[in-house]
Amino acid sequence: MHKSTGYAIIYVVRRNAVLWADKRYHSLDYEMKARYGHKIYKIALDGGFTCPNRDGLIDTRGCIFCSAGGSGDFAASRNQSITEQIEEGKQLLVGKQVSDSSQVSCYIAYFQAFTGTYAPIDRLRALYTEAIRHPEVAILSIATRPDCLQPEVLDLLSELNQIKPVWVELGLQSIHPQTAAYIRRGYPLSVYDAAVLNLHERGIEVITHVILGLPGETADDMLATADYIAHQPIQGVKFQLLHVLKGTDLYTDYLQQPFHVLTLEEYTDILIRCIEHMP
């Protein structure tokens, strides 16, 4: 079973005849260097959230592929303050001896674990403000569900977007209803569309997450998802290879009735074709 951790984040821009550094697509790394003059690193944070797909509002099982950590397995402990998590994340980057580490002066504070807008508004304000006010944080990025962007949350994000750029990362995964039902996404495509429009109207940048290789999906299905999001007013897309993680219901399904998991070559091929659908 192939379980690569590879992904590609594409910053969506109009296609032209030039190369973006050494790539033929506009990568997030290229965009950040163009904006800030050097590499920007993401620090994963855990705000102590849960998810309506876990607490019983929608379901109690979570999305079928989601780990016990709510996809925040690389975040620091939620028992630490946000500032402490940022400082720990900085030390991890230094410890890895990343290239051009002397330039590490700006970070993306990324609320990654569970649903990053699913909490009382006062708590969200406190968490986000602590992150965005950190002197070395350049961008506040929040992973969330499209159905967890109530008007008061949108107003808060708009307010913070005046201090530093705010990104919202939406877990769409697929546009196909049958797939959405299987992975227990818990909301229809129309909710995603409305969330993107609401964020766009407020000048908040949106990154859409898509999983390539979901069970039952063909190459044409994946390309249809890529084509759909390419026509939305979003600024980026993260193409993620399907992970079959131990302890998830997806892993149980795989053990009981193994499904095809993309090989590295298949993933590379479909990823290239998806990128070609970007504007």
Language model: regions and residue ranges:
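N-terminal [4Fe-4S]-dependent radical SAM core
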Residues: H2, V12-I108
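Short, positively charged and aromatic/hydrophobic N-terminal segments
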Residues: Y7-I10
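Auxiliary Fe-S-binding modules of radical SAM enzymes
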Residues: V13-Y30, A34, K39, G236, ...
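Conserved, mostly hydrophobic/aromatic
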Residues: C63, F111, L170, V237, ...
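Short amphipathic alpha-helices and their capping/turn segments at secondary-structure boundaries
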Residues: G89-G95, L149-I163, A194, L223-P233, ...
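Conserved SAM/AdoMet-binding glycine-rich loop
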Residues: D100-Y187, A194, E201
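Glycine-rich tight-turn/loop motif centered on a GG-T
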Residues: Q178-L189, D253-V261
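Conserved C-terminal portion of the radical SAM core fold
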Residues: S190-D249, E265-P279
